[in-house]
Amino acid sequence: MIKKTSRIHGWSEAKYWGFIRSCLRRAFQRYPNKYRTQASAKRVGGKYECNLCKKEFRAKDVAVDHIVPCGTLKSFEDLAVFADNMFCEIKGLQILCKACHKTKTLHERGMSDEDIKVSEFRKLPAKQQKEKLSMYINDVGKNQAERLKQYRELL
């Protein structure tokens, strides 16, 4: 099968729009409203309060989140909505700790709480998976597939 290419250097549509999306995300890093959101949320002592869990974090442990997701960017028709959502007003942005931001993003992508927990468990080294499971069951699975099944049953 011939790979569909329609852009410069033989890029596929997906690669081309991924590149455009990446450029827009990099531009957001310098967007004034991002800095204004951070500045207005800063507490005494340089800490920030997560808008979801309400705990305080250092600057390196928080992210500026779009309240309304930017959406997909897979074609020219998506570009205007994506850019409008990306470069929104300050009221469309919030400060989240990295853990809450990751969870919110995965929910927006359609993952359930259970799927997120299993995904995090899967990333643990085998030794830590076994330790975590051994607190609840006696016969811990010998391979990752068995341990994932056991973990999912515990949830």
Positions of the model-derived regions?
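Short, charged surface segments at domain edges that flank catalytic/cofactor-binding sites
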Residues: 2-54, 80-89
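Intrinsic-disorder-associated interaction segments
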Residues: 5, 9, 13-17, 21, ...
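Short coil/turn linker and secondary-structure boundary residues
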Residues: 48, 71-77, 111, 116, ...
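The −1 position to Zn-ligating cysteines in a subset of zinc-ribbon hairpins
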Residues: 49, 63, 96
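Residues in well-ordered beta-strands of folded domains
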Residues: 51, 65, 154
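Histidine-centered nuclease catalytic patch
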Residues: 55-92, 108-110
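A detector for short metal-coordination/catalytic motifs
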Residues: 90-92, 98-155
